[in-house]
Amino acid sequence: MVGGATSEGGNVWAWARRVLALPERDGAVEEALAAAEPDGHGLTALPFLAGERSTGWHEDARAALTGLGLATTAPDMLRALLEGVAFRLGAVYERLAPLASSDHTVVATGGALARSPT
């Protein structure tokens, strides 16, 4: 068994909802995220709020969000951060895929992932 760990998923979601004062469970944020064009916000996010685990293992890495403007919204920032998380998961997968058999199974865990409707 091979794997790669990240600390970004649920931690980024919880941090962004708290800091950006987004509602917890009304569904409006999720609807706005789903309706938004991928990368339509013009932001770039490095979601390393707790350092980086896979693939570089840089514990001192920190998050960054660039491209902010007067029209940037809280959901834009959350979307950019979550896209950064997805990019990180893709990077882990790219590293692991050559080591796996052609009929491999990807297993993802975590509270936020388990509660996600999609």
Describe the predicted segments one by one.
Residues 1-118:
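Active-site core segments that coordinate phosphate-bearing ligands/cofactors
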